């Protein structure tokens, strides 16, 4: 199959290493009161930019995942959780082709904030898989999937430096600077961006 760049799903923008991919803010009313404007300004300035620091773990063994490949997983761990570097583990091994850092991939995924334990995105909840380029996602996502295989279910935990720190967290405030992100990803298919297979001599 061919997974074209044009097939990128807008709802998966949290995965993309691009700033400003959140929804536009609602239009302001024609004549807002001075009091409401001041309150909004004060609330914005008071919003936290980072959670208190957490001693990072060097293992993801404490993250428990239940559910079969293809079904939305349940992810549980003790919060707040932080990881020292991007780490990944194959939970269910597939037998398909190996994923490279330049592939387009067709995946289902669920993302949970390591600090709060709250789910911030899930393709399963939208009822459709996501097609994206591993060259256009946050570093931790690329690191976690490179070298895995089609048919794998993969657990990935990434520190904020490999997540959304560079964009100041998520636009909706569900992810702050420094937050570790935990993903479970089912790799459904890939598309090659370079020649592959066995060379045949005429």
List PLM regions with ranges.
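Cross-family detector of peptidyl-prolyl cis-trans isomerase
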Residues: 2-202
């Amino acid at each position: 199959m061919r997974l074209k760049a044009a097939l990128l799903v807008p709802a998966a923008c949290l995965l993309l290493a691009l700033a400003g991919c959140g929804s536009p803010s609602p239009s302001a009313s024609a004549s807002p009161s001075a009091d409401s404007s001041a309150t909004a300004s004060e609330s914005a300035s008071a919003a936290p930019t980072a959670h208190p620091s957490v001693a990072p773990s060097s293992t993801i063994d404490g993250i428990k995942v239940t559910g079969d490949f293809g079904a939305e997983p349940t992810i549980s761990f003790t919060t707040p959780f932080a990881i020292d570097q991007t780490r990944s583990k194959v939970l269910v091994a597939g037998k398909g082709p190996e994923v490279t850092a330049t592939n387009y991939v067709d995946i289902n995924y669920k993302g949970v904030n390591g600090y709060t334990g709250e789910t911030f995105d899930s393709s399963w909840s939208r009822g459709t898989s996501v097609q994206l380029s591993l060259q256009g996602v946050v570093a931790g996502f690329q690191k976690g999937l490179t070298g895995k295989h089609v048919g794998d279910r993969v657990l990935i935990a990434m520190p904020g430096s490999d997540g959304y720190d560079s964009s100041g967290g998520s636009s909706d405030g569900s992810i702050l600077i420094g937050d570790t992100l935990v993903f479970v990803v089912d790799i459904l298919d890939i598309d090659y961006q370079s020649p592959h297979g066995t060379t045949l001599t005429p």
